[in-house]
A protein has these predicted regions:
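Acidic helix N-cap motif at the loop->helix transition within catalytic regions
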Residues: 43-51, 95
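Glycine-rich, basic loop-to-helix element that forms the pyrophosphate-binding segment
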Residues: 61-78, 88
């Protein structure tokens, strides 16, 4: 059994899938299974994956139930001990899965970890380097708009 599940939720995101899945195919750590949860898309998303990435486990929902339900559905269907939630419009570095897996394994008490998100439009800027929460539970993106070099 693989050690990691990568769960990708989708709704009519065909235009993003080649970039996302090509990056996953280049991972240095290969002990992962990809689960693709489709929220009733009307585009060619599932057909594209069946043709180009047939190893992907496709979970087709009959309607657009939204981000959370799709992620929860994929997480429940996975059998791997660790789960990475990944957006369909994401392009990851080749060591993405490896670094998250190694990071979570180093901390016995950790229940979650997060990747550094770099802006797609401005590749030298941080989109999110972890979140801060205030007393009311509002989340704030750490490092938003700051140089990537500050978060190495």
């Amino acid at each position: 059994m693989d050690k990691v599940a990568v769960v990708i939720q989708n709704y009519n995101g065909y235009r993003y899938l080649e970039t996302c899945f090509a990056a996953l195919a280049k991972q240095t750590f290969t002990e992962f299974t990809t689960y693709f949860v489709d929220n009733g898309s009307q585009d060619e998303s599932c057909a594209f994956l069946r043709e180009h990435y047939p190893e992907t486990k496709i979970i087709q929902l009959d309607d657009n139930y939204g981000f959370s339900r799709a992620d929860n559905n994929g997480t429940r269907r996975s059998k791997e001990p660790y789960v990475i939630l990944l957006n369909n419009d994401t392009e990851v570095f080749p060591d993405f899965v490896e670094r998250l897996y190694e990071g979570i394994c180093k901390r016995k008490n950790a229940f979650a970890c997060s990747a550094k998100l770099i802006s797609y439009q401005e590749r030298d800027k941080i989109d999110d380097a972890g979140n801060y929460y205030n007393m009311l539970g509002w989340a704030f993106a750490r490092g938003k708009g700051k140089p990537v070099s500050e978060f190495e």
